[in-house]
Amino acid sequence: MSEVTTAEFNEEGKYLRKIRSFVLREGRLTKGQAQAIESQWPTMGLDYSPVPLNLSEVFGREADTVLEIGFGMGASLVQMAKDAPEQNFIGIEVHKPGVGSCLSDAAIAGVTNLRVYHHDAMEVLEHAIADGSLARVQLFFPDPWHKKRHHKRRIVQAEFAELVRSKLKIGGVFHMATDWEEYSEHMLEVMNAAPGYKNQSVDDTVVPRPDHRPLTKFEARGHRLGHGVWDLMFERIV
């Protein structure tokens, strides 16, 4: 039985932290995933502490830092880190097999600019990331909670938008993607109303998939099912 923090919000977008106990059915680690965690965690793993990271110490350099919330199995995150060696990348994922897979792929790819948390993303963002320190925050294909009674569980809410804004540098970007059209409309409504942001779309809607975001398995699945994919990018201006 695992204690897992789940995000829940009231009708005004106020973040309500709730602790729910449930069995985390994430599957067993493969041998390769377990070996990757054992061998790569000392180098790429970040142990959670409620103290802001010193990014220059963590990465051994000064560089723009990109943070991804919920990287799944990590394939696209590793690809981004490989494609942009001049940037630092931090990924957060609660599912251990995903962490193991990401570390395995990162080791094979030889990336040195990636660090990983196996922890609740809200706690990391709130306490372990310094204000004004990030060049980009990425949230790709979050759970859409498509039933109306579950909409309050969606992570993109007014208070979350403000939390992300506080962690971005001026000029930093909050980049979201979803294959659920109604959720994209919800994201757009929340973000267009969020103070201190500017929509990077020319018509204040969505943007084409930028080159820096690789196609993911979720996106491929959406295409197979005849779904579209919507990218939203909002720049912190204040």
UniProtKB/Swiss-Prot annotation:
Q: Which cysteines are joined by disulfide bonds?
A: none
User: Matching PROSITE patterns, A to Z?
Assistant: SAM_MT_TRMB
Enzyme Commission code:
2.1.1.33
Q: Which residues form the active site?
A: 143
Give the UniProt keywords, A-Z. Methyltransferase, S-adenosyl-L-methionine, Transferase, tRNA processing
Q: In which pathway does it act?
A: tRNA modification; N(7)-methylguanine-tRNA biosynthesis
Q: Which InterPro entries match?
A: SAM-dependent_MTases_sf, tRNA_(Gua-N-7)_MeTrfase_Trmb, tRNA_methyltr_TrmB_bact
What's a single GO MF annotation on this record? Answer: tRNA (guanine(46)-N7)-methyltransferase activity
Query: Which PANTHER family does the record associate with it?
Result: 3-DEOXY-D-MANNO-OCTULOSONIC-ACID TRANSFERASE/TRNA GUANINE-N 7 - -METHYLTRANSFERASE (PTHR23417), PENTACOTRIPEPTIDE-REPEAT REGION OF PRORP DOMAIN-CONTAINING PROTEIN (PTHR23417:SF14)
Query: Per its record, how is this protein called by name?
Result: tRNA (guanine-N(7)-)-methyltransferase
- Give the organism the record lists: Shewanella sp. (strain W3-18-1)
